[in-house]
């Protein structure tokens, strides 16, 4: 597509022997877009995207002008169409996305169209990283055993992905055992400046030119934001939005407010990037940045590596922002070189960024932001976050005290908090606060050599003093790329990590996403028999309830060195700032300060062992896979041959009976309430990723289809089968439905509800199916921050398939709100100060929403009529959170995929 180029900014840039076409921001400023050089760097990337894609339809001149107007007001509610350069997926979200594409090919044929039109138009990379589970640990055979188990459990899914790789163009699969998608993206896939050949006229010459532009992406995982640390603008979206982008649909969004986060000073000795990101997360959650861009600026950036920046950018979902952006600077150029990017690409990035005013130096003027806040890096202290929120940062000396308070207040364990309990067949006892999982895991930290080498050096020092992990601790090391394993092995540090218990268990997300695997049976039994509040310490990004392990209630985020330290100590009830980790082989107490490595030593190891040659070697055959992958056979065909007996991959029902013209939207009349939830309901609560209980609706379904409980696998691997996922919706073991609140104030946990008007208690799935038989529409009520966490489109898909027409809450997290719209579910918010609780709702009410027929507008005020069981009526004002005109089109079509399919079939 050739831009209309209203601001005459199409120019050429010569880099070495090559000439590139680009859309010059400085030229656009001279030609009418006054002051745009003062924009935040992230907004400049959005502006370039609009200039390059101006077509008079999805991108008009007025949209481009709106960005300069934003500058004057520092905020502007204006809808734009953003076209990312590419799409990134992981397998938990990628499998259902490919299922949707396969189903769309079938639906396209039924509508009389060409199935080949359902094909990615931009590059799509799917990295298989979510399926490996830590079933084995603690020895050098653990890795191979876990790989064998992974292929055994996921053969059918992997065959399907191999079919997709062959059937769709522009679609590549990075096989299992390679790494975590965001780390592979940072270390290999991302280019910072992207190029594409296009036919166009430049000056008087018409032909094919190579166009250079900022690398950008959306991903089907919320931590796609990590790559903003390398100045690549990107964020997580639901799979359905990603599919629409793949098929040529621009991403509809409002111009964001941009919060400037000024960093000054430098971190003190012994402080890590993990401590910094937990501090940033706490500060930004307190400020409130949902739906906003955060951009980091200030002199402190000169003291951060790209790996440090990537750690901060990674946790944008945890602080609530759309992204946390860092501009191109000298550190970015150094990282591109160190990570083995081709020299011509590195030269292009440097030249392009400087030509566009996208290159930050110490002398660069501060951009104009909507608002700002400041952090002196010298104020950051060693920290952890827990026991159940990423923003719950606690300074290291206060962790033990914080757990003690939580034990009494959160977990209601007030009697004998220090009591120890026997473990069958073992000589040790365990108690509250004992660390039963210590995991070096997650791209958040394993992408950062400083904390990995720090952990290795700490392990070396601990082993030298005779320390090792306590026997009740399940230890694991799962790096985000093979590069990490290489430099740990080459440096000799892996051998020391092995000595204290941290053997390699796999390359993938593992414990961070709940794939921690089962605890040893005797430990699990002791925990559950005695009601022990056990702890996990992990170098991940999320510690929500029920996420890490069903046996663990208290979860703490920490740097890799602190993960090792807590494995040695064996408990979060010790103040590691002053109490010993244990007793050395000389009989003397060993303190954390005795074994903590210096930054000088860490940097020396990094300089010697983290080299471009390792990156080049490990990524040379990134798409090839191991022998297990290469053995997988698949049938090449335009449309997928669905196996009706499969419990992993099924043709979803979204397009059944679909016509070329959408059915008119109807009002919601006398809907029943399916569930009433509190604040901070995560997408994990709505659609869990972990283990499937035998007694759950999903477990019963699998049993009925002759699947043994040992082969249930987990919800995340079953996302290609709507029958399992519908039954798993709202089935998290920790979710609480306030409709079931007893007279004593207690609320049972798990996916339960009451069916009305009979008041019978049953599973949420069973109630939803009963309502469907009765042809009764449904709504869900919730509190604040509904749908935070993972970009899990099944949280919206499952909601829709249960028959829910609307979700009414105090506030939504960004991705889940757009996912609901993308599935044709109406998101609504209460006015400030109103909640279902303040209205006195009990759950037996009927809800009517009118005004959906005809002239519905984005962000329109609507009125709900709520009739209680006693016949009393309340009228409640609600805000329609369909935010843009494009979203309104999606809603009227029954969802974004229906909209795109009709458009392609026309």
From Swiss-Prot:
It comes from the Bacteria. Keywords: 4Fe-4S, Iron, Iron-sulfur, Lyase, Metal-binding, RNA-binding, Tricarboxylic acid cycle. The keyword Phosphoprotein does not apply. Induction: Higher under aerobic conditions than under anaerobic conditions. Its cofactor is [4Fe-4S] cluster. Disruption phenotype: Cells lacking this gene grow more slowly, but also reach a lower cell density than the wild-type. The ability of the mutant to establish an effective root nodule symbiosis with soybean plants is not affected. CDD domains: AcnA_IRP, AcnA_IRP_Swivel. Binds 1 [4Fe-4S] cluster per subunit. Its EC number is 4.2.1.3, 4.2.1.99. GO terms for biological process: propionate metabolic process, methylcitrate cycle; tricarboxylic acid cycle. It catalyses: citrate = D-threo-isocitrate; (2S,3R)-3-hydroxybutane-1,2,3-tricarboxylate = 2-methyl-cis-aconitate + H2O. [4Fe-4S] cluster binds at residues 443, 509, 512. Pathway: Carbohydrate metabolism; tricarboxylic acid cycle; isocitrate from oxaloacetate: step 2/2; Organic acid metabolism; propanoate degradation. Belongs to the aconitase/IPM isomerase family. NCBIfam families: aconitase_1 (TIGR01341), PRK09277.1 (NF006757), PRK12881.1 (NF009520). This is Aconitate hydratase A.
């Amino acid at each position: 597509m050739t831009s209309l180029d209203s601001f005459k900014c199409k120019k050429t840039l010569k880099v070495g022997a090559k000439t590139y076409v680009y859309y010059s921001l400085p030229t656009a400023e001279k030609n009418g877009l006054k002051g745009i050089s003062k924009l935040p760097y992230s907004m400049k990337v959005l502006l370039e995207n609009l200039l390059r894609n101006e077509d008079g339809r999805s991108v008009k001149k007025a949209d481009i002008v709106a960005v300069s107007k934003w500058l004057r007001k520092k905020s502007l509610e204006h809808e734009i169409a953003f076209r990312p350069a590419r799409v990134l997926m992981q397998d938990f979200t990628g499998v259902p996305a490919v299922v949707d594409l396969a189903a769309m090919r079938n639906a396209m044929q039924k509508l009389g169209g060409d199935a080949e039109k359902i094909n990615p138009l931009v590059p799509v990379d799917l990295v298989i990283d979510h399926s490996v589970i830590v079933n084995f640990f603690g020895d050098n055979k653990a890795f191979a055993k876990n790989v064998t188990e992974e292929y055994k459990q996921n053969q059918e899914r992997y065959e399907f992905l191999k079919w997709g790789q062959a059937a769709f163009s522009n679609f590549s699969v990075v096989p299992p055992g390679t790494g975590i998608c965001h780390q592979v993206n940072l270390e290999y896939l991302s280019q910072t400046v992207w190029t594409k050949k296009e036919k166009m006229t430049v000056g008087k010459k018409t032909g094919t030119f190579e166009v250079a532009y900022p690398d950008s992406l959306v991903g089907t995982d919320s931590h796609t934001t990590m790559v903003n640390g390398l100045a690549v603008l990107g964020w997580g979206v639901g799979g359905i939005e990603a599919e629409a982008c793949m098929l040529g649909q621009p991403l509809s969004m409002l111009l964001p407010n941009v919060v400037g986060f000024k960093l000054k000073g430098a971190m003190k000795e012994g402080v890590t990037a993990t401590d910094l990101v937990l501090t940033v997360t706490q500060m930004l959650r307190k400020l409130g940045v949902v739906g906003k861009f955060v951009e980091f600026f200030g002199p402190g950036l000169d003291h951060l590596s790209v790996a440090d920046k990537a750690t901060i950018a990674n946790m944008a979902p945890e602080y609530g922002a759309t992204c946390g952006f860092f501009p191109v600077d000298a550190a970015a150029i150094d990282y591109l070189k160190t990570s083995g990017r081709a020299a011509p690409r590195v030269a292009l990035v440097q030249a392009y960024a400087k030509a566009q005013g996208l290159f930050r130096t110490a002398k660069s003027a501060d951009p104009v932001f909507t608002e700002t806040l400041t952090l002196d890096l010298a104020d950051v202290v060693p920290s952890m976050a827990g026991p159940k929120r990423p923003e719950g940062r606690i300074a290291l000396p206060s962790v033990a005290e914080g757990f003690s308070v939580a034990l009494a207040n959160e977990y209601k364990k007030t009697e004998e908090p220090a009591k120890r309990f026997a473990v069958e067949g073992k000589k040790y006892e365990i108690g509250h606060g004992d660390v039963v999982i210590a995991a070096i895991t997650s791209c958040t930290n394993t992408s950062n050599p400083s904390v990995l080498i720090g952990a290795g050096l700490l392990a070396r020092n601990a082993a030298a003093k005779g320390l090792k992990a306590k026997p009740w601790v399940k230890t694991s090391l799962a790096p985000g790329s093979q590069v990490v394993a290489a430099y740990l092995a080459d440096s000799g540090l892996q051998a020391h990590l092995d000595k204290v218990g941290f053997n390699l268990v796999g390359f993938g997300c593992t414990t961070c996403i709940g794939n921690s695997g089962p605890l040893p049976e005797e430990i699990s039994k002791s925990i559950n028999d005695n009601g022990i509040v056990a702890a996990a310490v992990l170098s991940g990004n999320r510690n929500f309830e029920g996420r890490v392990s069903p046996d663990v209630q208290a979860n703490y985020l920490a740097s890799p060195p602190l993960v090792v330290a807590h494995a040695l100590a064996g408990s979060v009830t010790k103040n590691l700032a002053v109490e010993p980790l244990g007793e050395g082989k000389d009989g003397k107490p060993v303190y954390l300060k005795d074994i903590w490595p210096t930054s000088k030593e860490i940097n020396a190891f990094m300089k010697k062992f983290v080299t471009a040659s390792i990156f080049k070697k490990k990524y040379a055959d990134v798409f090839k896979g191991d022998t297990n992958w290469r053995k997988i056979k698949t049938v090449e065909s335009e449309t997928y041959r669905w196996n009706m007996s499969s419990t992993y991959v099924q043709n979803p029902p979204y397009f059944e009976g679909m016509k070329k013209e959408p059915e008119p939207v109807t009002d919601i009349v006398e809907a029943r309430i399916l569930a009433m939830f509190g604040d901070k309901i995560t997408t994990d609560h709505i659609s869990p990723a972990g283990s499937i209980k035998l007694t759950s609706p999903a477990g019963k379904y699998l049993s009925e289809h002759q699947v043994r409980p040992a082969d249930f696998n987990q919800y995340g691997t079953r996302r290609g089968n709507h029958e399992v996922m519908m039954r798993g919706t709202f089935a998290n073991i920790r979710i609480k439905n306030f409709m079931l609140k007893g007279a004593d104030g207690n609320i049972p946990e798990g996916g339960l509800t009451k069916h009305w008007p009979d008041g019978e208690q049953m599973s949420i799935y069973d109630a939803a199916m009963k309502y469907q038989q009765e042809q009764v529409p449904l709504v869900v009520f919730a509190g604040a921050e509904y749908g935070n966490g993972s970009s899990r489109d099944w949280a919206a898909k499952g909601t829709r398939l249960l028959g829910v027409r609307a979700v009414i809450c105090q506030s939504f997290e960004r991705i889940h709100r757009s996912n609901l719209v993308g599935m044709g579910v109406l998101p609504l918010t209460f006015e400030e100060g109103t909640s279902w609780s303040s209205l006195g709702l009990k759950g037996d009410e009927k809800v009517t929403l009118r005004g959906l027929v005809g002239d519905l507008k984005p962000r329109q005020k609507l009125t709900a009529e709520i009739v209680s069981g006693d016949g009393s009526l309340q009228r409640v004002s609600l805000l329609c959170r369909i935010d843009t005109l494009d979203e309104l089109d999606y809603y009227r079509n029954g969802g974004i995929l229906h909209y795109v399919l009709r458009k392609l079939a026309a």
